[in-house]
Design a protein with these regions (language model features):
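Cap/lid segment of the alpha/beta-hydrolase catalytic domain
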Residues: 101-125, 187, 290
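Conserved alpha/beta-hydrolase "nucleophile elbow" surrounding the catalytic nucleophile
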Residues: 71, 152-154, 228
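Primarily recognizes the serine-hydrolase "nucleophile elbow" in alpha/beta-hydrolase
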Residues: 82-86, 137-140, 145-218
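A domain-start/cap signature at the N-terminus of enzymes
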Residues: 2-17, 22-66, 79, 84, ...
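Short substrate-entry loop that stabilizes the transition state in hydrolases
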Residues: 60-108, 184
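Tryptophan-rich substrate-binding surfaces of secreted polymer-degrading and adhesive proteins
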Residues: 329, 341-411
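Alpha/beta-hydrolase active-site loop
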Residues: 118-141, 162
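Short beta-strand/loop motif that positions the catalytic acidic residue
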Residues: 225-227, 231
């Protein structure tokens, strides 16, 4: 047992009234198939004393993405895996799921220790244990090291922010569901930001993330934030502070570049070039949004802290680029500038300039026809990489061809 009795005694008093997801989730039976959630042992030194579970869909190809799922307090790996909706899309789009499990030996309510110094520091504790699980999946399942993502609920959402901050070289993107910003509370105190929020400037929030791995020079992860407007367990102010933290980390404004209305009274705010998303679910309490049903964008099983509203797993999977897109945050294609080669002077042949090829169609049709591609739920024009809007049949764009496989918006 890693925790001293005195620390456990102090933590028990603090967290007793601060349950981040205070009811165990009952696992439902898995579909009749060979693939099952399986416990993995000996995945590393495991300094955080966590259990590892993994799910590999049938016929998982080499180089598949991987998503880490982090449950809430008093929940477990099997229950969150079975009910959160992620298994459906892992089967459909072929990516692995890594599901860490906390224990009461570490924390009385089986909460991930998103506020304990040794567990939120790069290279130690629970953060390192989770990173070792990712390494194990890469080495043993052949997952793609460049397409690793994380999503967590409540205390797991707080730990999701920890992983994004401490291991930006491991995670390409992540989502924080009913969670909290990285280092929003002093060590061993859950109540500071949980119940009232902590108001810091975006720069102050961003500095906390950058200090988690100061030697990192590569890109920082993209982040999606989910929160119910009626959440009284982790107050909604934390969603705004998360937005401030990660927009600053990504170097974009705290003013949204686009907003949209989604089902279940969900308001979506998009920041930068889809760097950060914030989903505010009107009237929803504390939990992971699910939407049980057979529809393409439905998922999950409703229950305690799994709230029947909208399928967050679907939207996160699309945001991560797991639905067949090119991956998050596509890098624009840059064509080198070529100096023309001088040739003997000749009388030019004059020919009429042809009218440009312009096509108006749904964004889905543009992608299907090869005039555009999709990534993170959005369509982008081939060649120019201009964002056209949501990738679906309802958004319509006009594209003009300006060169071989090069299209721009407008005509």
């Amino acid at each position: 047992v890693r925790r001293s009795p005195s620390l456990l005694a102090r933590l028990t008093g603090v967290v007793a009234g601060a349950v981040l997801a205070a009811a165990a989730v009952t696992a439902v039976a898995a579909p009749a198939q060979a693939a099952t959630l399986t416990q993995v042992t000996n995945f590393g030194s495991n300094p955080g004393n966590l259990a590892m579970y993994a799910y590999r869909p049938d016929n998982l190809p080499a180089g598949a993405p991987a998503v880490v799922l982090l449950h809430g307090c008093t929940q477990n790996a099997a229950g969150y895996f079975a009910n959160s909706g992620w298994q459906k899309f892992a089967d459909q789009w072929k990516f692995a799921l890594i599901v860490p499990q906390q224990s009461s030996a570490n924390q009385p309510l089986s909460c991930f220790n998103w506020f304990v110094e040794q567990d939120i520091t790069r290279g130690s504790g629970e953060a390192l244990s989770i990173k070792q699980m990712v390494d194990h999946a890469r080495n043993n399942y052949g997952t793609d090291a460049s397409r690793v993502f994380v999503s967590g609920l409540s205390a797991g959402g707080g730990m999701s922010a920890v992983m994004l901050a401490t291991y930006p070289d491991v995670f390409a993107a992540g989502s924080v569901v009913a969670g909290l910003p990285y280092r929003c509370s002093p060590p061993a105190s859950t109540s500071t930001c949980q119940y009232s929020g902590v108001n810091r400037t975006p720069q102050e929030w961003g500095n906390l993330v950058r200090a988690a791995y100061p030697g990192h020079t590569g890109p920082r992860p993209r982040v999606a934030v989910w929160h119910g407007t009626s959440d009284s367990t982790v107050v909604p102010a934390n969603a705004t502070e998360l937005r401030d933290q990660w927009t600053n980390v990504r170097g974009v404004s705290q003013t949204p570049t686009r907003t949209a209305s989604l089902p279940a009274n969900t308001a979506l705010e998009v920041y930068g070039n889809d760097d950060v998303r914030v989903y505010r679910v009107s009237g929803m309490g504390h939990g992971t949004p699910v939407d049980p049903g057979p529809g393409a964008e439905q998922c999950g099983t409703a229950g305690a802290y799994l709230l029947d509203t909208i399928c967050s797993a679907y939207h996160d999977a699309v945001f991560f680029g797991l639905n067949g897109g090119t991956g998050p945050n596509p890098t624009p294609t840059v064509s080198p500038t070529v100096s023309p080669t001088a040739s003997p002077t000749a009388s030019p042949t004059t020919s009429p300039t042809p009218a440009p090829t312009c096509v108006t169609a749904s964004n889905y049709a543009h992608v299907t026809a090869g005039r555009a591609y999709h990534s993170g739920g959005y369509a982008y024009a081939n060649g120019s990489n201009q964002r056209m809007g949501l990738y679906n049949t309802f958004y319509t764009s006009t594209l003009k061809q300006t060169g071989p496989n090069h299209w721009v918006i407008g005509c």
